[in-house]
Amino acid sequence: LNLPIIYTEQYPKGLGPTVKCLRQKLIDNKSKKIEKTTFSAFDNEEFKTYMTQINKKQIIIIGVESHICVLQTTIDLLENDKQVYVVEECVGSRKLENADMGINRMLKNGASLINFEMIFFELIRDAKNQFFKKLSSKFVK
């Protein structure tokens, strides 16, 4: 779909890298990796610079922890005039109640809660799209 993908790793030297199966898919898609120690990715200069370079108004966000890094990044993106879409089944926390609180706070601050299928069909727009058959077979049964 030719969407820019940025993924951040929170202090990988201490916490470890992104899990191997996901990391390999991100590498295969030529995603931009940014290591950070800040909880909000927006407090990382490399992240801010890259966001300026790609110049996108709408941001789809996934990750962990919903109530820490995802929350702080979402709020900062919203405060910087971005439209943020949080993918419900792609965010989480160690405790369910923390994830729920994080999601609720993101929504109260102006983020939109969406799911993976919503993203897919909104981006594809038409069953004739070249990506529809290839990608829809992975989750539409």
Describe each model-derived feature in a short phrase.
Residues 1-4:
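A short, N-terminal amphipathic alpha-helix
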Residues 7:
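Alpha-helical substrate-recognition element adjacent to the catalytic core
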Residues 10:
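Active-site anion-handling motifs in enzyme catalytic cores
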Residues 13-141:
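Active-site-adjacent betaalpha module
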